[in-house]
Amino acid sequence: MIFKEYATQVINLVNKSTEDIRERNHGLQGTLYLASVEGHAPRLYAQWITAFHKKNPHVQYSLWNGNSDDVVHRVMNGLCDLAIIIEPHNAEGVESLPVYQEPWVAMIPASNPLSQNPSPTIRACELLPYELFIPSRTSRLEEISKWFGPDAKPIVRGRIAHLLSAYELTRLGVGITIYPASAGDIANLTDVCIKEIVEPANTASYILIWNKYRQLSHVAEEFLNFIKER
């Protein structure tokens, strides 16, 4: 057992020395495996990668997206280095860094009477008579249901992981979508109306996560440090 541990240490040192020499000669290399939810997370990655790429042009990127539960699963099983999710999370062994906040909004079909009100906000109770689409994360249904009070039950017609699907269903008048405010980034505002949900006001809080029990690759450590310094 002692010999095996010693041999592992020697191999790790050799690999690190080889990596250091390659980095001195050619710059930082390797592949960053990233995952995220939708909403504002893809924009964060785009901003970070753009700036990081200017300093490290040889790094490659593999990006994957899904709902928060799926993303956490990938982190905990070593399928990605770093990931962005929306709180809350209850995964043990996850380190996190807050990176962004935005309000929740209702994306309403232009044909819906609610879209005729010029107010930029809407109370949660006003959505009760209508069929809703919400993010697909398991815990999100319970969270959103609480917005309507203990005696009310929203009509949740669908659970959606991808923003484009939510937008298309809303645009065609199937229902109203509840999503973080960045949903408005892709919306054609002649087809849908975006209103911030108030009473209660709620915030979508994005966090960057990684598995504290797994050693990050060198390129992932450099990327994480780069984000922390911004």
Model-derived regions, located:
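Short beta-strand->loop
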Residues: 95-105, 110, 177, 181, ...
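Flexible hinge/capping segments at coil-to-helix
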Residues: 94-132
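Hydrophobic hinge/microswitch elements
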Residues: 67-72, 76-80, 85-86, 137-195
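Secondary-structure junction motif
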Residues: 120-124, 129-152, 216-224
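Short, well-ordered beta-strand segments
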Residues: 31-35, 83, 107, 133, ...
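A late-sequence structural motif
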Residues: 44, 174, 193-230
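Central regulatory/effector-binding core of bacterial HTH transcription factors
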Residues: 29-92, 160
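Alpha-helical "hinge/linker" immediately C-terminal to small N-terminal DNA-binding modules
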Residues: 1-23, 29
